[in-house]
Structure formats: C-alpha cells, structure tokens
A protein has these predicted regions:
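Extended alpha-helical "rod" scaffolds
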Residues: 1-182
Length: 182
C-alpha cells in the first residue's frame, strides 16, 4: 500500500504542474482537488472495509495519511498564480474563485474529504481519552457520524468496559454530527 500511495502522490504532483500551465487557478484547483479527494476517499473506505485493525496497521495507515497530507503544499495559493489565472486560457470569463490569499492551504475547499482523512489519521493514533476529546471537544463530529466513530472504536480496540462506556456516551451525545457518510 505504501508504494501505491507514493506513486499516486508523485502522479498528482506531476499532473498539478502540467495543469497549472494551462488552466485557470480555479479550474486547476478543482481538477487537482478532485484527484486528492479520490485518494482521501479511497483511504477512508479501505479503513472502514476492514474487519479489524491492529495497532501496527493503524500506525502504518496513519503514516500514509501523513504522506498524503504533504499534498497540502499544492494548495497554498500565491497571489501571482491566482491573479494570472484568468488570462491563461484566454477567456477571462470570470470563472475564477475569489479568494483571500493567506498562507493556509485551501485543500479542504477543493477536496471535501480532506479533513475527514486527516481526522482519521488522528483517530487511528489515539487512545480512548483522545477519541473522547476529539468527539466532544473538537470537530470530529463535523467529519464523522456517531456510527462511523463507533465503528472505528470497535475496529481498533478490544471490547471492554471503557470501550463500551465511550460508545454509549457517543451514541447518547447531543453533539452536532455531520449527516453524510464517506
């Protein structure tokens, strides 16, 4: 799996450079974002398709997610590329997205499963206390449904009173959760 991920990352970077020369910024970001989103969805679905997940496997997957998140650097806009984007295809038709150009990557804007994949990496490396914090005090509930978090817990931990307690608390929580599954 690691070799496959590295190959995909190289391919996305090559396509990014090729497309950057011929597409407006918004078209480029949408196209590259689509590729990145496909990788994120594949990683997420591969994890949820498992019957169990040992600590070593979880760490390997989390490390792969870290490698994929390095693609964030593609989505740090520079004012030159965005300003020149309307002239690249010669249309100047105003299809470019107006953006506040900061230093934060815009990856999540163009790859809707990006944050979910990043949270998955965190959950895979977390203990029960960290998962509790991520669900109740952080934004995990914005990216995962209650059932998805329960499934991840059951996938990663042996069934014991602490696991059952956390699952019960999550199921009974009033936390606003996202509506859509991967």
């Amino acid at each position: 799996m690691e070799q496959g991920i590295e190959t995909v990352i190289i391919h996305i970077r090559k396509m990014s450079e090729t497309w950057k020369k011929v597409l407006s910024y918004s078209a480029w970001a949408s196209a590259v974002g689509s590729l990145v989103n496909t990788v994120a969805k594949k990683i997420i679905s591969d994890v949820f398709d498992r019957d169990d997940l040992g600590a070593d496997e979880a760490n390997i997957i989390a490390e792969l997610i870290v490698k994929v998140t390095a693609l964030d650097d593609l989505f740090i806009p520079d004012s030159q590329s965005v300003q020149n984007s309307s002239g690249k295809n010669g249309t100047g038709n105003g299809d470019d997205v107006e953006m506040d150009l900061g230093t934060a990557p815009l990856t999540a804007r163009f790859a809707d499963k990006w944050l979910k994949m990043q949270y998955l990496g965190e959950v895979l490396q977390s203990n029960l206390a960290n998962i509790r914090f991520l669900w109740f005090e952080s934004s995990l509930s914005l990216e995962f449904t209650k059932q998805e978090v329960v499934d991840l817990i059951l996938l990663s931990f042996e069934n014991n009173p602490h696991v059952r307690g956390l699952i019960k608390d999550i199921k009974e929580s009033e936390v606003k959760e996202m509506d859509e599954q991967w």
